[in-house]
UniProtKB/Swiss-Prot annotation:
Positions bound to Zn(2+): 212, 221, 224, 227
Residues holding ATP: 32-42
Organism: Leptospira interrogans serogroup Icterohaemorrhagiae serovar Lai (strain 56601)
Family: Belongs to the QueC family.
Transmembrane segments: none
Gene that encodes it: queC
Keyword NAD: no
GO aspect biological process, one term: queuosine biosynthetic process
Name under which the protein is recorded: 7-cyano-7-deazaguanine synthase
Function: Catalyzes the ATP-dependent conversion of 7-carboxy-7-deazaguanine (CDG) to 7-cyano-7-deazaguanine (preQ(0)).
Length: 242
C-alpha cells in the first residue's frame, strides 16, 4: 500500500467504531450466519456488554458450511447458540436454495437484484428472533445488514428495518406494554473496508468466518458477490484474514 492509503487506514483505525450501540438491558439476540458481517456484529454485541443468545438458520442453503463456522465462534466464546431448521421449500426462486439456478460470478454491483436474493429471508429470520427475544426478556436484536458494500437486497435497507421495528412495537406484548425490542444494525452504513477494520479492532477471529455463496469442497469459489466483497474489504485494509 502507498503512504496515502496507510494514512487513510490510520484515520479509520482511530475512528471509534466500537462505541456502544445500545444502552438498554444486557440481553440480546444476535442473528449469526457464520459470515464476516454477522460475526463482526456478534463481537460488537459483546463490546456492548450484552448477554447473548445467538440464532442461526439451516434453510437448505448451498453455503451451509457457514453454520459450521458459526458453531466454532460460539463455542470459542461460550455463547448459547440455536440453529433453527427451516424447510427449503419455503425459499424458492433463489440460487442459494435451488441448485438448478446458477450463482452469478464476477458481477458485483449490477443494478438489478441478483438471484442470490432469498425471498422473505430476513422477514422470517427477524420474526424468529423477535419471538426468542421476547421469550428471553431481551431488549434488542443485532443483525449484520449493510447497505453500502452489498448485493442490493431490499431486506437489508434501513427503511425495511425501521418498518419491521414498527411491526414489533405494534404486534408484541413487550411493544404494547413498555419499551419495544430494538433492532440494532451496527454495520448498516459501513463500507466493507470499515467492517474489516471494525472487526480487527474488536478482535474478531477472521479465520473462523466464511463468506461464499457457492463453495466447493469446503472452499470459497472466489468469484461470487460474497467472495468479491470480502476480498475487497481485506485488500483495502491490508488486514490479514488469518
Amino acid at each position: 500500500m502507498n503512504s496515502s492509503s496507510n494514512e487513510k487506514n490510520k484515520d479509520l483505525n482511530r475512528k471509534n467504531f466500537s462505541s456502544k450501540t445500545d444502552s438498554s438491558n444486557n440481553k440480546a439476540v444476535v442473528l449469526l450466519s457464520g459470515g464476516l458481517d454477522s460475526t463482526t456484529c456478534l463481537y460488537q454485541a459483546i463490546a456492548d456488554g450484552k448477554e447473548i443468545q445467538a440464532l442461526s438458520f439451516d434453510y437448505g442453503q448451498r453455503h451451509k458450511i457457514e453454520l459450521s463456522y458459526a458453531k466454532k465462534v460460539t463455542r470459542k466464546l461460550g455463547i448459547p447458540h440455536t440453529i433453527q431448521k427451516l424447510k427449503p421449500e419455503l425459499f424458492l426462486g433463489s440460487s442459494l436454495t435451488q441448485k438448478s439456478l446458477h450463482v452469478p460470478k464476477n458481477s458485483l454491483r449490477k443494478e438489478e437484484i441478483p438471484n442470490t436474493y432469498v425471498p422473505g429471508r430476513n422477514i422470517l429470520f427477524l420474526s424468529f428472533a423477535v419471538s426468542l427475544a421476547e421469550g428471553t426478556g431481551s431488549d434488542s436484536i443485532y443483525i449484520g445488514v449493510n447497505s453500502m458494500d452489498y448485493s442490493g437486497y431490499p431486506d437489508c435497507r434501513p427503511e425495511f428495518i425501521k418498518m419491521f421495528e414498527m411491526a414489533i412495537q405494534l404486534g408484541t406484548k413487550k411493544g404494547s406494554q413498555g419499551p419495544s425490542i430494538k433492532i440494532l444494525t451496527p454495520l448498516q452504513n459501513l463500507s466493507k473496508k470499515e467492517i474489516v477494520l471494525l472487526g480487527n479492532q474488536l478482535k474478531v477471529p477472521f479465520h473462523l468466518t466464511f463468506s461464499c455463496y457457492d463453495p466447493k469442497n469446503g472452499k470459497a469459489c472466489g468469484k461470487c458477490d460474497a467472495c468479491l466483497l470480502r476480498k475487497k474489504g481485506f485488500q483495502e485494509t491490508g488486514v490479514s484474514e488469518k
